[in-house]
From Swiss-Prot:
Phylogenetic placement of the source organism: Bacteria, Pseudomonadati, Pseudomonadota, Gammaproteobacteria, Pseudomonadales
Self-association and partners: Homotetramer.
Binding residue positions for substrate: Y24, Y129, R164, R278
Protein name: L-lactate dehydrogenase
Superkingdom of the source species: Bacteria
Length: 381
């Protein structure tokens, strides 16, 4: 197997994983137009090539809050990561820490906070959903604090679950889902043994620690579905801001007015994100939304971005459009599914190499020198 880009990991992951798991990660909402535009819109951004600038000294290092990152990349929160590799959250976190970048743990991870945090030598980030069960939210925040988490990523673009039609076709949901998942596992023996057997318990660790009983896949879907809160408003977040004294990032911003509201709220950062095209189909890609948001709030808080980033070249494009740092989700998940921690390590090395090539050939010697002047044209211009 030749791995030269993140797309190779995607192809290999499709072969290795049971279809219900591959398509759960790979799919988006409705007809998946936004999912596709996240990638194609980034690919349509042309960089301005510059030469003869003595690029012998180059630095990808950047500062974010009180952290130093080896490059402006963090691993995004991805639910059920531990179903893609044995104790997957631990493996991904170790790869990120070894590369000098943050790992963001999902609320709905397989491994609990208490298993992942001690496995790495730098503080991880923790992602939290807005849920009706405020007791769970407080419990999760308290446990994250106790584990040394400094940065909270608060996801606000999921007041209701997205309509992900591909899940019904793949067996993740829909008629005879449990039976279809078992049959798929039987035809993927490598995954079935390594993750299905050796990766137990298949629990949602953060939730079961609070509820006091194991939570399987069906319980996960039911519990979350009943706990998303469509009544949420900025006012409801005030108690979290009072409770959490570390950096707080609001994830799921696609509109400049919402970005301004995040500044008023006192957020330390935002993530320009459409949830990887998994929530509302037909909204702007992150690449299209980012410039206007950067114009509105750049300098008032840190701007992160995700959705559609598949290479180090895409990282450079997002930075040029106004992001300070980017989050990668599917790309690292595919690498994790194929080769575990070593796969994520290799992926991050590929991203760094691709960033270095792009920076040398655009004349940017540091991350701060990647600006809109690095673009021939912006998307849609």
């Amino acid at each position: 197997m030749i791995i030269s880009a993140s797309t190779d990991y995607r192809a290999a992951a499709q072969r290795k994983l049971p279809p219900f798991l591959f398509h759960y990660a790979d799919g988006g909402a409705y007809a998946e137009h936004t999912l596709r535009h996240n990638v194609s819109d980034l690919a349509g951004i042309a960089l301005r090539q510059r030469v003869l600038n003595n690029m012998s000294e180059l630095s990808l290092e950047t500062k974010l809050f009180d952290e130093t990152l080896s490059m402006p990349v963090a691993l995004a929160p991805v639910g059920l990561t531990g179903m893609y590799a044995r104790r997957g959250e631990v493996q991904a976190a170790r790869a990120a820490a070894a590369h000098g970048i943050p790992f963001t743990m999902s609320t709905v991870s397989v491994c609990p906070i208490e298993e992942v945090a001690p496995a790495i030598n730098r503080p991880m980030w923790f992602q939290l959903y807005v849920l009706k069960d405020r007791g769970f939210m407080r419990n999760a925040l308290e446990r994250a604090k106790a584990a040394g988490v400094k940065t909270l990523v608060f996801t606000v673009d999921m007041p209701v679950p997205g309509a992900r039609y591909r899940d019904a076709h793949s067996g993740m949901s829909g008629k005879n889902g449990p039976l279809r998942r078992v049959l798929q596992a039987m035809t993927h023996p490598e995954w079935a043994w390594d993750v299905g057997v050796m990766g137990r318990p298949h629990d949602l660790g953060n939730i079961s620690k609070y509820r006091g009983n194991p939570t399987g896949l069906a319980d996960y879907i039911g519990w979350l579905g009943n706990n998303f809160d469509p009544s949420i408003s900025w006012k409801d977040l005030e108690w979290i801001r009072e409770f959490w004294d570390g950096p707080m990032i609001i994830k799921g911003i696609l509109d400049a007015d919402d970005a301004r509201d995040a500044v008023k709220f006192g957020a330390d950062g935002i993530v320009v994100s459409n949830h990887g095209g998994r929530q509302l189909d037909g909204v702007l890609s992150s690449a299209r939304a980012l410039p206007a948001i950067a114009d509105a709030v750049k300098g008032d808080l840190k701007i992160l971005a995700d959705s559609g980033i598949r290479s180090g070249l895409d990282v450079v494009r997002m930075i040029a459009l106004g992001a300070d740092t980017v989050l990668i989700g599917r790309a690292f998940l595919y690498a994790l599914a194929v080769h575990g921690q070593a796969g994520v390590k290799n992926l991050l090395e590929l991203f760094e190499k691709e960033m270095r090539v792009a920076m040398v050939l655009t004349g940017a010697k540091s991350i701060s020198e990647i600006t809109r002047d690095s673009l021939v044209r912006e998307l849609g211009a």
